[in-house]
């Protein structure tokens, strides 16, 4: 495994981190989930990314992770970097969602209990909810660190203006933002570019704002939820997220333009000696501002395939040009 420092900090993360968004909930096979977490740790993936609403059912990924940790990895807690987040819908009533102090304080206590932990290594505000003042949310994160419930704090998916404000507040309190999470893939470059291809605004680039403020960047959905693999080349498989009526990927996302682009990218990957998925991961990691990339896997074999992306992280100028000619199109973006 290769490791990289988070922004202007002394914390290192593996280039590939394991996300528990899918495949670790109560509807999934517990033994398979356990095998994947233990295999990841054995392979040097020491960073595990959770959120209180991960499952399904919400909270069940935390519960399963806590059980696996308790049964197998308790002695290795100090070798692990465990992340958690709160801010999306979690429990009934007006306090079960959003970025308020009320929600974050209740959420971290619940999450620590489900995960059987005394503290998280990092705790994120999972989103800017559009209503709660950033000052309120950041003060909650600051207090969470001062209470010993998390060592570091982070933000996820914050728009550029709120992102900078969050950094300023945290810095003034001497609790700097360790990590900023954004979605990024060959088909989703808004955070990287500051807008859609051909209409980007570098001043709104979440990546550059993070880099300017010393925050590490961690990317999620690097495979565009399977679109940057061969999964959808010949239609929609019955076991795919789209077929399961995912709230995050729809049949309308599988456009002819994206399928053709994925096939063209697949040819470049083949010439590089990689699978499409491996090249897509390598491409995200090729941005020097990126600390780590979160992968979501459904099997040990799939995880091992993703890990092989680290065998070839370099792109020639010719490869970069060919790739950019394929992906620098607004119609490919989400």
Q: What do the predicted segments below correspond to?
A:
Residues 1-80, 146:
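N-terminal binding-site loop/beta-alpha segment at the start of enzyme catalytic domains
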Residues 7-25, 83-96, 119, 124:
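N-terminal small/glycine-rich loop or linker at the start of catalytic domains
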Residues 14-18, 48-50, 80-84, 123-125, ...:
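Hydrophobic faces of well-ordered beta-strands that scaffold small-molecule active sites
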Residues 112-133:
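Active-site groove signature of glycoside hydrolases
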Residues 134-326:
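Beta/alpha (TIM)-barrel catalytic core signal, keyed to glycine-rich beta->alpha loops juxtaposed to Asp/Glu
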């Amino acid at each position: 495994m290769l490791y990289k420092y988070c922004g202007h900090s002394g914390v290192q993360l593996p280039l590939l981190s394991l996300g528990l968004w899918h495949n670790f909930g109560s509807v999934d096979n517990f033994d398979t989930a356990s095998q994947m977490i233990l295999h990841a740790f054995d392979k040097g993936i020491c960073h595990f990314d959770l959120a209180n609403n991960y499952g399904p059912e919400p909270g069940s990924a935390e519960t399963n992770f806590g059980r696996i940790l308790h049964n197998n990895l308790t002695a290795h807690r100090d070798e692990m970097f465990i992340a958690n987040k709160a801010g999306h819908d979690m429990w009934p009533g007006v306090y079960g969602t959003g970025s308020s102090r009320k929600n974050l304080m209740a959420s971290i206590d619940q999450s620590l209990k489900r995960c059987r932990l005394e503290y998280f290594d990092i705790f994120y505000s999972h989103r800017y909810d559009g209503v709660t003042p950033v000052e309120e949310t950041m003060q909650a994160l600051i207090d969470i660190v001062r209470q010993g419930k998390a060592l570091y704090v982070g933000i996820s998916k914050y728009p550029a203006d709120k992102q900078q404000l969050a950094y300023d507040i945290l810095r003034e309190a001497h609790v700097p933002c360790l990590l900023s999470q954004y979605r990024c893939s060959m088909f989703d470059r808004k955070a990287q570019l500051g807008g859609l291809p051909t209409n980007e605004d570098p001043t709104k680039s979440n990546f550059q704002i993070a880099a300017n403020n010393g925050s590490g960047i961690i990317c999620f959905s690097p495979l565009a939820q399977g679109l940057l693999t061969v999964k959808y080349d010949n239609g929609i498989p019955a076991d795919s997220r789209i077929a399961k009526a995912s709230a995050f990927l729809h049949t309308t996302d599988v456009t002819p333009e994206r399928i053709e682009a994925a096939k063209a990218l697949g040819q470049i990957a083949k010439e590089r000696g990689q699978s499409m998925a491996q090249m897509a991961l390598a491409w995200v990691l090729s941005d020097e501002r990126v600390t780590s990339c979160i992968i979501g896997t459904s099997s040990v074999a799939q995880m091992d395939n993703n890990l092989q992306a680290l065998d070839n992280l370099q792109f020639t100028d010719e490869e970069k040009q060919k790739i950019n000619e394929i992906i620098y199109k607004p119609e490919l973006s989400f």
